[in-house]
């Protein structure tokens, strides 16, 4: 969302997006992103016209992502990660997705619990903290 709505971390996310590596995300980023945009609209952070533009930009960005789907093994791994690290279900799916992509994958998150779990699982995190 930090590419669509300017907030803390938007500059770093833009730099990472423009880096010469493929951007990937778990498939849950789509409903989470749409929910965040709708919440921003309801909360008055986006006008009706800004909301429409943000949705269009979000859809465009989605088309550029490598999306990691959820299958039974990934769901089970997410369950294990949730239990081991005390994560919420969707955060565990995001971490399992990053781990499934393998070495060299950096998980980008501002959620401290998810960042801690990623680091403990051997997954690099951004922003550095």
Residue ranges, per PLM feature:
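Acidic, PIN/NYN-like endoribonuclease modules and their adjacent C-terminal/linker elements
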Residues: 95-129
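Short active-site oxyanion
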Residues: 20-23, 64-66, 102-106
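Residues that scaffold the ATP/ADP-binding catalytic core of kinase and kinase-like folds
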Residues: 2-4, 36, 117
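Short glycine/serine- and small hydrophobic-enriched flexible loop segments
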Residues: 35-42, 103
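Short, well-structured N-terminal submotif of metal-dependent ribonuclease cores
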Residues: 1-29, 40-52
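Acidic catalytic patch
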Residues: 27, 53-84, 92-93
